[in-house]
Structure formats: C-alpha cells, structure tokens
C-alpha cells in the first residue's frame, strides 16, 4: 500500500517507518497521523515484524506540526483544533501500545509533535548535535499529543515546566543527559548504534 507522508518497509523482521516530507522537515499533519495509526496497527499484528524503527527522511526527524495546516484549523474555529489534539493523542497512545520494541532514531532537528512521537517510543537514540525544542509556546500553542505527560514523566515537573514555558532549544546530548532520550552518540556513530540495538 502506498502512503502519502510515510515510507514503510519491512526488512529482516524490522519495520522501518520514515516520515517522508524532507522539504518541509517532516511535519506530522493530521493525514500523516492517520497513516501512522494505520501503520502502528500493522506493526502490532504482523507476526513477521519483531521490531519497529521510526525516523525522518533527509537527515531530520520532524519539525513537529504543519504550521500552515494549524493556521487553517484555527481560522476554521475551535472544533478543528480539538480534533488535531485528539488525533495526536490517539496516534501516540496507539504507538505506546504496540507490543514490540519501538526505536526512535533522531537526528537533525526535532520539535513539538515530533518530540511527542519520539517520546512515545520505547527507546530514543539521538545524534548528540540534534537541535531539539518543545516549541509550543513559541507559536502560542498548548502542548498536545501527550507532550505534557511524556516530558514530565521523563524529566520531572521542574525541568518540564522550564522547557514548556521557555521554548528554549537544547541538544540531543542534553536531552540524553536529562533522561529525555535513551542515549546520544556522535552523529557519525548513529547508524552503527542503531544497528547494535536492532541486533539485540
């Protein structure tokens, strides 16, 4: 089956889900969320799949929500915004319930809804120089897609509040040091480290 926003392939019992809109830094608009929910179902119930890897095309994990689509929803009124929040939460809850290990392979940049997606995985392996932000406050948006729970659970209330309220940028290495990511490695070692996780 062909997907508009996602590249999907299975090789040696590993499912590779790649956010595939590199020209826009792999945003996660609502149609992409629907595709991801469908793929998480496939990964969960296909006995040939033993492990799932999620990453972004073009050297960037995900810039988060599609700002143009978000602006259009706001112009349509509150109902569109509520639907967006609900769909993001549904996507990440479905991901968290996949009964196989899921690895987020993070590089380039990650923000907003992309961060929520990565934190819903079992493991987060990041390039140490990844540019990270929770960004919601910078666009006047409330953290959605389970972000408030996921981030607070990972780093505690004090640091989570700082990150949400400041919208500051931090590196993949800092994220790993805080416990937000599983680990960070030099960028040139990312593929090798991912391969070791897969081999386990």
Question: What residues fall within each predicted segment?
Answer:
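Glycine- (often His-adjacent) and acidic-residue-rich active-site loop
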Residues: 56-93, 110
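Conserved CoA-thioester-binding segment of acyl-CoA-metabolizing enzymes
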Residues: 1-57, 93, 191, 197
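Generic recognition of short, well-ordered alpha-helical segments
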Residues: 30-31, 65, 116, 146
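Hydrophobic/aromatic residues within transmembrane alpha-helices
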Residues: 17, 54, 66, 117-118, ...
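Helix-loop segment at the mouth of the active site in Rossmann-fold oxidoreductases
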Residues: 28, 70-73, 98
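Crotonase-fold acyl-CoA enzyme core
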Residues: 93-200
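Histidine-centered beta-alpha loop that forms part of the nucleotide-sugar donor binding/catalytic region
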Residues: 20, 65, 107
